[in-house]
Swiss-Prot record:
Coiled coil: none annotated. It holds the Pfam family HTH_3. SUPFAM superfamilies: lambda repressor-like DNA-binding domains. This is Putative HTH-type transcriptional regulatory protein PH1808. Keywords: DNA-binding, Transcription, Transcription regulation.
Length: 315
């Protein structure tokens, strides 16, 4: 299955299970699909080979997920070494990766994955508190239970503290010993975004000038390299995000990017704006295109947001 076929296949799954979707046709983008259902928002990258996912794409995807309180996911079919298996969670640069089958099972059948692939094989996460309670209830010392399992005391202590994943073999032995389920499902929707840095390093002089002006207006700016927009501009007081594009001049590519920004803004409940060095003011699919000179005359964030709203309303 080629990448475009995979994107369409994944989108079909999401639509069947009640998601509203937007497909991003942008070469090299950090995501291919935005999907929303009730309060859940997903940014999904679909790749036949998940090893083609770059670290730069991963960093941008994590930034977007943190800014929009979304879940980032990589959906694929294989790695460079093997086919991906249903029910198993893989990981690339801190982004969980699953198969289309696992995606369907999670949402349509309520069956979250239980197994995580790490270097050396397949592992599970177990309920450490429950394990300790069962061990004490059955009268086993740490040394005795470790001996039964064929592992070290230190390993068992780490399992009870939830500090380590457990091999499938050991997990099965534990459940046989206690006749109780101990394996915890893996919540692939809960991404580890706490340490994600929301940087704003510009790629060129024009970006630098626009970013500096936006910050002077009282807005924060987060640089995104692998999307149809250049940055997310955030107005903190009212919690408003702007998908912000920047170009030297208006071209066909600018208009295509503006259309994609319009579609994404609608799905995520945001607004879009483009700042172009050489252009006249106009609106493309609800996305205002502002001459850079006009931006320079704006005095604060409220004035910019009001201008965007007025231009959208009049278009």
């Amino acid at each position: 299955m080629e990448r475009n076929e995979l994107v369409n296949f994944v989108e079909g799954i999401l639509k069947r299970i009640g998601f509203r979707t937007m497909k991003l046709e942008f070469r090299g983008g950090c995501f291919d699909l935005v999907a929303t259902r009730q309060l859940l928002l997903l940014f999904i990258k679909a790749l036949a080979n998940i090893d083609k996912f770059s670290e730069e794409q991963a960093e941008d995807l994590k930034k977007l997920a943190k800014l929009f309180k979304a879940s980032p996911l990589l959906v694929g079919l294989r790695s460079k070494n093997a086919e991906l298996e249903d029910g198993v969670v893989y990981e690339r640069f801190g982004i969980y990766a699953i198969t289309p089958g696992t995606l369907y099972s999670m949402f349509a059948e309520g069956e979250p994955p239980l197994i995580i692939a790490e270097r050396g094989g397949f592992y599970v996460r177990i309920d450490g508190k429950k394990l300790k309670a069962l061990r004490e209830e059955h009268g086993y010392s740490i040394t005795e239970l470790a001996g039964i399992l064929g592992i070290s005391r230190k390993s068992l202590q780490r399992y009870e503290k939830g500090e380590s994943v457990v091999s499938l073999e050991v997990a099965l032995r534990l459940e046989e010993v206690f006749d109780e389920p101990l394996v915890k499902p893996i919540d692939v929707l809960r991404a580890r975004l706490k340490d994600v840095t929301l940087t704003s390093e510009p790629d060129n002089i024009l970006e630098k000038e626009v970013f500096e002006k936006l910050r002077k207006l009282g807005m924060s700016v987060v640089k995104i390299k692998t999307a149809p927009f250049n940055a997310i501009t955030k107005e903190e007081e009212d919690d408003i995000e702007l998908l912000t594009g920047i170009d030297e001049r208006k071209t066909g590519r600018t208009l295509k990017r503006a259309e994609l920004v319009s579609q994404m803004a609608e799905v995520v409940g945001s607004d879009g704006v483009f700042v172009v060095k050489k252009a006249r003011m106009e609106v493309v699919r609800n996305v205002p295109i502002l001459p850079k000179k006009l931006l320079e005359e704006i005095k604060d964030a409220d004035e910019l947001l009001e201008l965007i709203r007025d231009l959208k309303f009049k278009s």
